[in-house]
Amino acid sequence: MKKLIISCCLLATFSAAGAWADAAGDLQQRLDKVKSFHATFSQKVTDGSGTSVQDGEGEMWVQRPNLFNWHMITPDESILISDGKTLWFYNPFVEQASASLLKDATSNTPFMLIARNQASDWKQYHVAQKGDDFSLTPKSADGNLKQFTINVAQNGTINQFSAVEQDGQRSNYALKSQQSGPISADKFKFRPPKGVTVDDQRQ
């Protein structure tokens, strides 16, 4: 009887691991169908009790695996750009920019996961699938991300994604007007405007 229970437990473990692997593989394959795209998005942030904290809008350009431009327009403008090697973050209001190596960037943020779509990133999560909805839970509890969900159609179109932090704060992003196709290389270049203070962390 004891051997039977152990066997059943092992089978359940292997079955769950297989399901996670299949879900992660399906998610990566779907995202791979669209190599580059532009979309506008709306953002809604709520705290742990569900109270609205912030509403915002912006647009994004992605050219996988390592080129992206995330432009938050409202309520406070900010820009996150990767040229494939350097990750730039620019805050126009305070006239400050930071530069870090992309290879050192954390994969513990939803946008980085979507933009890079690298198998090594997905392996850090337990991935569950229900239709077009994918739920990701970090295998390590060290980061601030508690759960990440994303809705991706079979053709690779991302409809929405959300992130829940350890304190219960939830950020929802709904994508609109998504268009796939070539993107100008200029979208992935950043040159700090005159007068901007730069914190260079690449060394």
From Swiss-Prot:
Cross-referenced NCBIfam families: lolA
Any one GO cellular component localisation term in the record: outer membrane-bounded periplasmic space
Family indicated by similarity: Belongs to the LolA family.
Localization in the cell: Periplasm
Protein name: Outer-membrane lipoprotein carrier protein
Superkingdom: Bacteria
Signal peptide, first to last residue: 1-21
Pfam families the record matches: LolA (PF03548)
Segments of this protein annotated with the region Disordered: 174-203
Record function comment: Participates in the translocation of lipoproteins from the inner membrane to the outer membrane. Only forms a complex with a lipoprotein if the residue after the N-terminal Cys is not an aspartate (The Asp acts as a targeting signal to indicate that the lipoprotein should stay in the inner membrane).
GO biological process: lipoprotein localization to outer membrane; lipoprotein transport
Keyword annotations of the record: Chaperone, Periplasm, Protein transport, Signal, Transport
